[in-house]
């Protein structure tokens, strides 16, 4: 059996595919797995590093907006898409996969479209509450579409063969909170706030925390992942404190999650899957420039289920710290939110998806 995956550009699209591929080979060691990607995406280095075969195609996403310059650029992009479609048709004929899986990003569009033209079984895994253009268009003819948020269904024209499966994500084993705090050199009996914003960091989160750091540290521990963008600057400006751990990157996320009573972060699909799998209480600040504002849709889904609170990026400077402190001081509200978050969890998402792929091949 052969399975071809397409999804990349960013880790948010690639890592669900990698999790599914690993689970497929665990369930059925004879399955042959390969990936399709671009040389500019994260998949160009990550897929070979993990030992998977990678086929490269040249394709780019359409530019949003309207101007003569953008029109010309989009015409070039459409020409590249047509050329990549021809290449992927040849690839599908030579590789002859039993199932083609798309996990989003513009790289998945030509492969899924070509597979549908050739009558191949296709499975789409959509990570966000607001589906991308590729999912919305190609879901019409997909064998199965798997969504991570039930709200995504209403944006799909063909609602048959749509399943709520969740997002494959890293699974962490919860540890004792006091022991986890000790790993960061923090007091075991203080409420603890975890703030992170991705590898580069989130400037609006950093600015909000820095502006009211003394207020925070007066009553709570803070684990603060600053990211590479502001890391050195903040390190030079912030005074050491026994209640503060800060660094550009957190190596031990399992301990960081376990130490935290409240987590402040963006609303990317992978982060939300990790949070709900652990039943963590979250204060979400959606990235305002995400495509089609999909992070806001993701956050809104959890808010509507009572599983998170949300602060707009534009209001983070004034509202983030007061909201976080209020939540840290309200144990009853945190307990209810934790239960609600756990109800949105899909810790077995990778396994369920792998079994669906195997089922399509039969």
Curated annotation (Swiss-Prot):
GO MF terms listed in the record are:
UDP-N-acetyl-D-glucosamine:N-acetylmuramoyl-L-alanyl-D-glutamyl-meso-2,6-diaminopimelyl-D-alanyl-D-alanine-diphosphoundecaprenol 4-beta-N-acetylglucosaminlytransferase activity; undecaprenyldiphospho-muramoylpentapeptide beta-N-acetylglucosaminyltransferase activity
**Cell location:** Cell inner membrane
Note the Pfam families from the entry: Glyco_tran_28_C, Glyco_transf_28
A biological process from GO = cell division
Q: What class of enzyme is it?
A: transferase
Q: Does the keyword RNA-binding apply?
A: no
Question: What pathway does the annotation place this protein in?
Answer: Cell wall biogenesis; peptidoglycan biosynthesis
Please indicate which superkingdom the organism of origin belongs to: Bacteria
According to its UniProt entry, the function of this protein is described as: Cell wall formation. Catalyzes the transfer of a GlcNAc subunit on undecaprenyl-pyrophosphoryl-MurNAc-pentapeptide (lipid intermediate I) to form undecaprenyl-pyrophosphoryl-MurNAc-(pentapeptide)GlcNAc (lipid intermediate II).
Q: Which PANTHER family match?
A: GLYCOSYLTRANSFERASE, UDP-N-ACETYLGLUCOSAMINE--N-ACETYLMURAMYL-(PENTAPEPTIDE) PYROPHOSPHORYL-UNDECAPRENOL N-ACETYLGLUCOSAMINE TRANSFERASE 1
* Protein name in UniProt: UDP-N-acetylglucosamine--N-acetylmuramyl-(pentapeptide) pyrophosphoryl-undecaprenol N-acetylglucosamine transferase
Provide the species name. Answer: Chlorobium chlorochromatii (strain CaD3)
């Amino acid at each position: 059996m052969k399975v071809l995956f397409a999804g990349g550009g960013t880790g948010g699209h690639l890592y669900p595919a990698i999790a599914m591929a690993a689970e497929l080979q665990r369930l059925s060691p004879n399955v042959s797995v390969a990936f399709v990607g671009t040389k500019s995406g994260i998949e160009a280095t990550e897929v070979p590093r993990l030992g998977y075969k990678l086929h490269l195609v040249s394709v780019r996403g359409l530019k949003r907006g309207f101007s003569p310059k953008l029109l010309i650029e989009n015409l070039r992009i459409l020409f590249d898409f047509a050329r990549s479609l021809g290449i992927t048709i040849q690839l599908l004929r030579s590789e002859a996969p039993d199932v083609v899986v798309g996990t989003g990003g513009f790289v998945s569009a030509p492969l899924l479209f070509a597979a549908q033209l050739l009558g191949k079984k296709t499975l789409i895994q959509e990570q966000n509450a607001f589906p991308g253009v590729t999912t919305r268009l190609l879901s019409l003819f997909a064998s199965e579409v798997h969504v991570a948020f039930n709200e995504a269904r209403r944006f799909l024209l063909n609602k048959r063969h749509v399943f709520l499966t969740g997002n494959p994500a890293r699974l962490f084993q919860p540890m004792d909170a006091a022991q986890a705090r000790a790993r960061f050199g923090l007091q075991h009996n203080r409420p603890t706030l975890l703030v992170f914003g991705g590898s580069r960091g989130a400037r609006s989160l950093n600015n909000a925390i820095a502006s009211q750091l003394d207020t925070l540290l007066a009553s709570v521990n803070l684990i603060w992942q600053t990211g590479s963008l502001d890391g050195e600057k903040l390190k030079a400006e912030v005074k050491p404190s026994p209640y503060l751990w800060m660094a550009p990157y957190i190596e031990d996320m399992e301990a960081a999650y376990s130490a935290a009573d409240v987590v402040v972060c963006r609303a990317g699909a992978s982060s939300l899957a990790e949070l709900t799998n652990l039943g963590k209480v979250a204060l979400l600040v959606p990235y305002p420039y995400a495509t089609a504002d999909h992070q806001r849709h993701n956050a809104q889904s959890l808010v509507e289920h009572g599983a998170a609170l949300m602060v707009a990026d534009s209001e983070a400077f004034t509202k983030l710290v007061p909201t976080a402190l209020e939540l840290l001081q309200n144990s009853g509200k945190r307990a209810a939110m934790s239960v609600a978050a756990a109800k949105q969890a899909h810790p077995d998402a990778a396994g369920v998806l792998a079994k669906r792929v195997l089922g399509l091949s039969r």
